[in-house]
């Protein structure tokens, strides 16, 4: 889950160790690194650390340069990392086995940054039972950890993906999508979950705290 997330580092030291390991074949030690992160509650410290000089402080200490870039689209951050535009990216361990691995990128996870004890959720509009998801369109980031959460939710009620229709939706568009009349079910992660739940129509019917491990 998002909770098995691979933050490549929260200090410049661990980032440097991770990134250097990706560049061991280079003749000279690598000095410049680019880190991509996207909007998930467990990864937001990257933005804070970059904005408040914490990343620079530790980078200076170890004689390296670290550029931290925020992406509003999770999949795009992984695509850019896979294409070689970034040296590191924040992602879940599960998603690290999809896009980067399929692209032939040998990725090393430095730390497990957090555990999603409810940070990922299936939310229905004006319905409060998981069984109500049957027959609905479900908006989520396709083939991501959200897709896995949906599969586990359906499995828990003896159902399967055949009983719903998955609508691939960028996390950058998820909150706005929920606010439209056409969308009645979404799977996403915090802080998007918290924002969507501010709408009185939104009901969490399944979340990652219900999946052991």
Residue map of PLM features:
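Bacterial N-terminal signal peptides
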Residues: 9-20
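Periplasmic-binding protein-like
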Residues: 113-124, 203-213
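Short, polar/charged alpha-helical segment
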Residues: 32, 39-70, 99-102, 148-155
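Pocket-lining segment of extracytoplasmic ligand-binding domains
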Residues: 95, 166-167, 172-213
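Alpha-to-beta junction loops
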Residues: 81-92, 103-107, 136-137, 179-188, ...
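A local structural motif
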Residues: 28-34, 56-70, 85, 134, ...
């Amino acid at each position: 889950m998002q909770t098995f997330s691979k933050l490549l580092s929260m200090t410049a030291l661990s980032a440097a160790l991770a990134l250097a390991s990706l560049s061991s074949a280079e003749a000279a030690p690598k000095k410049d690194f680019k880190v991509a992160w996207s909007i998930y509650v467990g990864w937001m410290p990257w933005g804070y650390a970059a904005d408040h000089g914490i990343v620079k402080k530790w980078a200076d200490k170890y004689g390296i340069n670290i550029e931290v870039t925020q992406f509003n689209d999770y999949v795009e951050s992984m695509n850019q990392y896979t294409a070689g535009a970034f040296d590191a990216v924040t992602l879940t361990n599960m998603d690290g086995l999809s896009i980067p691995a399929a692209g032939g990128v040998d990725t090393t996870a430095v730390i497990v940054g957090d555990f999603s004890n409810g940070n990922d959720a299936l939310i229905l509009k004006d319905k409060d039972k998981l069984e109500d998801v049957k027959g609905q369109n479900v908006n989520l980031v396709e083939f991501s950890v959200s897709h896995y959460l949906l599969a586990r939710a359906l499995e828990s009620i003896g159902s399967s993906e055949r009983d719903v229709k998955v609508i691939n939706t960028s996390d950058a568009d998820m909150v706005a999508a929920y606010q439209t009349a056409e969308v009645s079910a979404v799977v996403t992660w915090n802080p998007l979950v918290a924002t969507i739940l501010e709408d009185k129509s939104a009901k969490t019917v399944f979340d990652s705290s219900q999946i052991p491990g």
